[in-house]
Structures are given as C-alpha cells and as structure tokens.
Amino acid sequence: MGLKADNWIRKMALEHKMIEPFCEANIGKGVVSYGLSSYGYDIRVGREFKIFTNVNSTVVDPKNFVEENVVDFEGDVCIVPANSFALARTIEYFKMPDNVLAICLGKSTYARCGIIVNVTPFEPGFEGHITIEISNTTPLPAKIYANEGIAQVLFLQGDEKCDTTYKDKKGKYQAQTGITLPRILK
C-alpha cells in the first residue's frame, strides 16, 4: 500500500473528479492553509456547523441521536464553547476510487490551539461530503474559520482491489451531503 503524491492526487481530481471543488495550489497566506500539498490534500471546512449544547438536558446516544443535542449555526467564524464539540462538513465532495483508502489528520495550526479534529477513514468506493468532528479541549472558547483549512487527507492505494467497497455494501453514509448526524441501520 503506497502513499500517493501530489501529481497522482491532481490527476485523480481533474480527470476522475475525486475531489470537487479542487484547489491545485496550496493557499496559506493569511488563512489556515488548504489545497494540494506534496503528499496530501488540505480540506476546507464549510460554513454550516452543529454545536453540541446541554440546553435541553439530553443525553448523547449514538444509537438514538436526537437533534436537540445540537444547535445549528451558519457563518464565517464558528465559536466552539470551552470543552465542547461541534460537527461540520467539508466544502469538498469526494469520490474515492475502489482501491484507495484515505486517512484524515488534523492541522497543526488548530492542534496547537487545543482544537482536535477527528474524521474517520474514507473507504474505497465512498462518495460524499465529509462530516468533520471538532473538539475544543481548552477551557476557553475557540474560533473555527469557515472556508479555510481544517485537516489534511492522505491517500493510500492498495496493492490489490478489495472484494467489497463502501458503495457495494451500501454504506449508511454513502452520498451524504451537508453535515450527517450519527445513523444506526435498523
């Protein structure tokens, strides 16, 4: 399994629409950087957020998630409360090849501010916007800048094609758009 370089990422984005919209340059002046890098792609966070709240005294249950757990927010800067959590989505829409797995890691700019980003792997055959989990581990409110970089995606190409892709198994988050809350298939 090999880590893919910028030339491969560019080709897959431009010829196979693996990343849309695709930013061929790495933009970093005056913003949290985003776009193509040497061995990855820095994704941007959109303007929509779901911020966790305790206003309704609910319990977070991944098997029975309720909308009352979150407050919707849209804007250029999202303030994540101290020791709190928010969901967001990428601006980019991904179409993963059947022999490629992507791993996403948080950006050091945010990590050095106590903001941890978690994104689960993009499985072979997955298609959709990526839901981003943002955790503010500090005792202070933290700013997240929409339309700027939030994490870096690394693409790993398998030595052979898997038997069953995410699309084949009709994954529960396949073709998701916007921020997708937890789902349990019944």
Curated annotation (Swiss-Prot):
Which pathway, per its entry? Pyrimidine metabolism; dUMP biosynthesis; dUMP from dCTP (dUTP route): step 1/2
Entries under PANTHER family matching the protein: DCTP DEAMINASE (PTHR42680:SF3)
The UniProt entry annotates the active site at 133 (proton donor/acceptor)
Functional note: Catalyzes the deamination of dCTP to dUTP.
- Catalytic reaction annotation: dCTP + H2O + H(+) = dUTP + NH4(+)
Which EC numbers does the record give?
Answer: 3.5.4.13
Give GO MF terms, alphabetically: dCTP deaminase activity; nucleotide binding
EC class of the enzyme, as a word: hydrolase
CDD domains recorded:
trimeric_dUTPase
This chain belongs to the protein called dCTP deaminase
Q: Which UniProt keywords apply?
A: Hydrolase, Nucleotide metabolism, Nucleotide-binding
A Pfam family name for this chain? DCD
What are the GO BP annotations of this UniProt entry? dUMP biosynthetic process; dUTP biosynthetic process; nucleobase-containing small molecule interconversion
